[in-house]
């Protein structure tokens, strides 16, 4: 299949592109390039790509593709709070516009990278895809809005699937240090402490970036009649853990001491997720990597590739990177690339 992969120079896209290529797909990327040089270790080999702001994509850019995998977004809650209106502009309006243009261009399948954050404050019970949604951040709200708008676009000729990823972890050449496991491991190696700013009680489902990539690859080739219009949680119940439990895993792999301060106050985002629909609809997608696997992988990568405090707190933190691009006049207040 000919695949357009948006966000191919991001954390997930850099892992996903080679997985898709190994499965025999012809991959073209689309990325604005904010994080292209945010690399730890050897530079990845990117697929051919279009350097375009998501808000400026045209139908002509999408012609000839069999499927679009849409990863590109302002990718976490702190970025959403930085500029909520821009979060909605990019994550919601531009994403739905992309889907409409893809349908207009004759693309048959649209895989949307959603999030388990749509469940928000769900408590201790397992939540499945038909649960009431309770997003608590602009990032999560934007994802819910896109899912609803995709429902209106879905028909016999345009198969949309919203894949609700658990919180990602694991090494990517274009690393992120602002997601929970990656952050805790890095801080532990740099300081000797596993620092948890919440009280440690919120539940989080975690999933390795490579497992996410394999799920998307499976969704590409699944029967359209089986997956059309579906919302599918991406992860495994084995990785439903509290933040304190994640910290204990990191301590075991690094030898660092756990320190739970609670200074950030109560985090309303807490949810345990049911992944049985994934196993039923995409049985070939084997989510298999544990949190301990990811912690060991990250420890080795951080040590082998020379992680430093400056890299950890700036290059690989999305909010810090956006601010750096703005302060150096490479992007403007609307997050558009400066001429």
Residues of each region from the PLM?
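SDR active-site strand-loop-helix element
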Residues: 6, 30, 68-71, 110-116, ...
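Active-site helix of classical SDR
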Residues: 142
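Conserved catalytic-core motifs of eukaryotic protein kinase domains, centered on the activation segment
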Residues: 39-41, 78-85, 121-125, 173-174
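C-terminal substrate-binding subdomain of Rossmann-fold SDR/epimerase-dehydratase oxidoreductases
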Residues: 197-339
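NAD(P)-dependent short-chain dehydrogenase/reductase
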Residues: 148-204, 209-218, 249-250
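Conserved Rossmann-fold NAD(P)-dependent oxidoreductase catalytic core, especially the SDR/UDP-sugar
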Residues: 96-138
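N-terminal Rossmann/SDR dinucleotide-binding element
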Residues: 1-67
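NAD(P)H-binding glycine-rich loop region in Rossmannoid oxidoreductase-like domains
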Residues: 54-90
């Amino acid at each position: 299949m000919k695949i357009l992969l948006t966000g191919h120079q991001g954390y997930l896209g850099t892992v996903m592109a080679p997985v898709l290529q190994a499965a025999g797909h012809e991959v073209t990327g689309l990325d604005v390039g904010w994080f292209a040089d945010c690399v730890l270790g050897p530079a990845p080999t990117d697929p051919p790509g279009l350097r375009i702001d998501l808000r400026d994509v045209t139908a002509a850019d999408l012609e000839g593709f069999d499927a679009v995998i849409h990863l590109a977004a302002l990718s976490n809650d702190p970025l959403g709070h930085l500029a909520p209106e821009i979060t909605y502009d990019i994550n919601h309006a531009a994403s739905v516009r992309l889907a409409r243009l893809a349908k207009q261009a004759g693309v048959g399948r649209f895989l949307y990278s959603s999030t388990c954050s749509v469940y928000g404050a769900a408590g201790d019970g397992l939540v499945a895809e038909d649960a009431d949604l309770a997003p608590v951040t602009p990032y999560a709200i934007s994802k819910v809005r896109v899912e609803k708008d995709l429902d209106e676009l879905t028909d016999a000729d345009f198969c949309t699937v919203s894949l609700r990823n658990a919180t990602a972890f694991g090494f990517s050449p274009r690393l992120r240090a602002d997601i929970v496991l990656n952050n805790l491991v890095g801080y532990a190696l740099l300081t000797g402490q596993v620092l948890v700013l919440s009280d440690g009680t919120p539940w989080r489902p975690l999933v390795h970036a490579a497992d996410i990539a394999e799920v998307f690859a499976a969704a590409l080739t699944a029967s359209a009649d089986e997956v059309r219009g579906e919302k599918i949680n991406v992860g495994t119940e084995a990785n439903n853990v509290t933040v304190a439990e994640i910290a204990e895993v990191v301590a075991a792999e690094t030898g660092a001491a756990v320190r739970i301060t609670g200074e950030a106050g109560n985090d309303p985002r807490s949810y345990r997720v049911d992944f049985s629909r994934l196993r039923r609809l995409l049985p070939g997608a084997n989510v298999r990597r544990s949190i301990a696997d990811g912690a060991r992988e990250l420890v080795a990568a951080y040590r082998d590739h020379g992680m430093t405090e400056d890299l950890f707190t700036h290059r690989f933190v999305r909010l810090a990177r956006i601010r750096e691009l703005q302060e150096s006049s490479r992007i403007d207040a609307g997050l558009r690339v400066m001429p």
